[in-house]
Each structure stands twice: as structure tokens, then as C-alpha cells.
Amino acid sequence: DVIGPQAQVTLANQD
């Protein structure tokens, strides 16, 4: 799914 990669980016943003 396209949301797959997007979810990972969100987690990285929490840095």
C-alpha cells in the first residue's frame, strides 16, 4: 500500500 512508506516517515519525524 502507498500508506506503508508514509507511516515509516511519520515515525522518523517523531525523532
From Swiss-Prot:
Lignin degradation and detoxification of lignin-derived products. Active against a variety of substrates including the benzenediols hydroquinone and catechol, the benzenetriol pyrogallol, the methoxy-substituted phenol 2-methylcatechol, the aromatic diamine N,N-dimethyl-1,4-phenylenediamine and the nonphenolic heterocyclic compound ABTS. Shows highest degradative activity towards hydroquinone with lower activity against ABTS and N,N-dimethyl-1,4-phenylenediamine. Activity towards pyrogallol, catechol and 2-methyl-catechol is considerably attenuated. Shows no activity against tyrosine. Activity is enhanced by Al(3+) at concentrations of 1.25-2.5 mM. Activity is reduced in the presence of Cu(2+), Hg(2+), Pb(2+), Fe(3+) and EDTA at concentrations of 1.25-5.0 mM. Activity is not significantly affected by the presence of cations such as K(+), Ca(2+), Mg(2+), Mn(2+) or Zn(2+) at concentrations of 1.25-5.0 mM. It comes from the Eukaryota. Binds 4 Cu cations per monomer. Copper is inhibitory at concentrations of 1.25-5.0 mM. Its cofactor is Cu cation. The lineage of its organism: Eukaryota, Fungi, Dikarya, Basidiomycota, Agaricomycotina. It is found in: Secreted. It catalyses: 4 hydroquinone + O2 = 4 benzosemiquinone + 2 H2O. Displays antiproliferative activity against a number of human tumor cell lines and inhibitory activity against HIV-1 reverse transcriptase. Its main location: secreted. GO terms for molecular function: hydroquinone:oxygen oxidoreductase activity; metal ion binding. Belongs to the multicopper oxidase family. This is Laccase. Optimum pH is 5.2 with ABTS as substrate. Optimum pH is 6.8 with hydroquinone as substrate. One of its GO terms (cellular component) is extracellular region. Optimum temperature is 30 degrees Celsius. Activity declines sharply as the temperature is increased from 40 to 80 degrees Celsius and is abolished at 80 degrees Celsius. GO terms for biological process: lignin catabolic process. Keywords: Copper, Lignin degradation, Metal-binding, Oxidoreductase, Secreted. Its EC number is 1.10.3.2.
